[in-house]
């Protein structure tokens, strides 16, 4: 098949981890895998996540020498440097009359947001790249993650931190082949079946929604509500699926704590922040609710 799957069996659960099947088999890479897992455990990753990242490492290691002979290339930055569980607020850009996207991003970053997704559905490629260059610089200055919505090619050209893929966009396995294992790849989900598919496709996080009606999307999937989130998160726990999950879609401020109580690890916001006159202050207020563990300041 197209996927190579490893399994972790513990007294409490069985976890499956899949990556795109490489040209060559994994025979002889056991020492590499065990060393990688041990390294991720040392960094504080839970065992299932350490195994998943170790599998990523081995997959990149195998691909570092296409002949499968002699020395393999040194593997550097084979996984995103930021633990996404510790960045539970994501801002998704949208058009706002009188306030440019770079101005929006500057405001939310000043308020403490450390994850921005550039979403410009109505813009052409040239405008997205031009805006993306400015947004990337703002994110770098504030130590924030910079992801591009939908377009893998643009994410590659901008050297973004990653890409978020909708259900009808490129397969995450193909995006991983193009972007590499050091980039963040997120995927949209509306059902538990979607989550299983994305998990098998080795996304780094899931955008789960919509929570309720939202004006930022023209084609809306079925609304989940708190009950929908609870059912999906319960199923994830039962099946041993460990991924950061961000709720998205029409979230209001008084929805945040009930949503987090379902087991969702974060939220993605657009209108709630964008429509506030003081975006920086509103961002700070939301972050205080989320009790975010702040990222270290950017180097240099």
Model-derived features: positions:
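Glycine-rich beta-strand-to-loop/alpha-helix junction loops that act as flexible
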Residues: 29-30, 208, 245-251, 267-273
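Conserved phosphate-donor
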Residues: 1-18
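Histidine/lysine/aspartate-rich catalytic loop segments that bind and position anionic ligands
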Residues: 192-222
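Charged C-terminal helix
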Residues: 48-86, 295
């Amino acid at each position: 098949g197209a996927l190579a799957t490893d399994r972790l069996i513990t007294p409490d659960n069985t976890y499956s981890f899949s990556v795109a099947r490489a040209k060559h088999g994994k025979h002889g890479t056991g020492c590499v895998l065990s060393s990688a897992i041990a390294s991720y455990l040392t960094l504080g990753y839970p065992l299932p996540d350490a195994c998943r990242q170790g599998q990523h490492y081995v997959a990149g290691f195998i691909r570092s020498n296409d002949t499968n002979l002699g020395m393999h290339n040194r593997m550097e930055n084979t996984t995103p440097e930021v633990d996404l569980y510790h960045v539970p607020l994501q801002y998704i850009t949208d058009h706002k009359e009188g306030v440019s996207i770079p101005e929006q991003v500057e405001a939310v970053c000043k308020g403490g947001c450390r994850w921005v997704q550039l979403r410009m559905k109505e813009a052409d490629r040239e405008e997205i790249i031009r805006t993306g260059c400015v947004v990337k610089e703002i994110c770098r200055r504030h130590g924030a993650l910079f992801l591009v919505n939908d377009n893998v090619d643009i994410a590659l050209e901008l050297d973004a931190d990653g890409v978020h893929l909708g259900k009808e966009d490129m397969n995450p396995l193909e995006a991983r082949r193009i972007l590499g294992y050091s980039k963040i790849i997120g995927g949209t989900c509306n059902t538990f079946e979607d989550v299983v598919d994305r998990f098998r496709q080795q996304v780094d996080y899931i955008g789960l929604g919509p929570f309720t009606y939202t004006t930022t999307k023209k084609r809306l999937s079925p609304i989940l509500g708190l009950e929908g989130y609870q059912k999906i998160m319960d199923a994830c726990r039962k099946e041993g699926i460990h991924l950061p999950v961000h709720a998205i879609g029409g979230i209001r401020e008084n929805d945040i704590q009930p949503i987090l109580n379902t087991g969702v690890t974060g939220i993605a916001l657009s209108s709630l922040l964008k429509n506030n006159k003081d975006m920086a202050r509103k961002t700070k207020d939301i972050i205080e609710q989320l009790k975010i563990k702040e990222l270290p300041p950017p180097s240099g």
